[in-house]
Amino acid sequence: MSADLNRDYEIGEEIGRGRFGVVHRCTSRSTGEAFAVKSVDRSNLADDLDRELAEIEPKLAQLAAAGNPGVVQVHAVYEDDSWTHMVMDLCSGPDLLDWVRLRRGAPVPEPVAADIVAQLAQALALCHRRGVAHRDVKPDNVVLDVEDDGENSSPRARLADFGSAAWIGADGGRAEGLVGTPHYVAPEVVSGGDYGEKADVWSAGVVMYVLLSGGALPFGGETAKDVLSAVMRGSVRFPPRLFSGVSPAAKDLMRRMMCRDEWRRFSAEQEQPT
């Protein structure tokens, strides 16, 4: 741990672990306020792309979060020759994946799912206007602040983990590289060419599908390769046993979000359900 980080924060228990780093609870020594700190040991990253992503993450996370209530806020960054530490909001609830799993296969009520997706769309729209593509939108990377007001109340949802993010500029720039999570990645990413911010919209469409189906995924397979093949060749279907109670408008929105033609796909601005 950085000496400067330890000077300013008391480091507590581990609360999460991901591909690149580990997350601990921490407490400000000056105010007593609780935060989360994500720590990445860059010296352990052998892949050039991984090192590049780890180096740029703090800058893109701060840019995406500033004045954006739908993104977990970054309060401080500490870096030395090997480590990067980001002090961030400590969210009170689970991530969206765990929240869905707690429902044991029951679909999220459509108004609640629509509200969560609208919050995600608003967050992504501001990220995209600032030239940041997240590139790994999935339930695991959406954290919740949940009020105990019944199953039909909507939690506050915030986008987290910019560890795969790319700078594309605010003028419709493009990114490259197979980055993201197989079940949520857009076909243009899988194809190996360049792609824009609408890859995030595809991923958000998969998130909406997961919410309304009670945890099912639109594209599956036994291996990551199988899943990516399904993403490339498949089309979105809504099995009646899972979607009989979902409105035509919600299904149409998901089709537009997961449109295979990137140029006809909704933008994050258009994505917000009504």
Regions found by a protein language model. Give the residues of each.
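Conserved N-lobe beta3->alphaC-helix segment of eukaryotic protein kinase catalytic domains
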Residues: 40-65
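A conserved loop-to-beta-strand element in the N-lobe of protein kinase catalytic cores
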Residues: 72, 81-89, 97-98
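Conserved catalytic-loop aspartate of Hanks-type protein kinases
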Residues: 200
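Activation segment signature within eukaryotic-like protein kinase domains
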Residues: 116-117
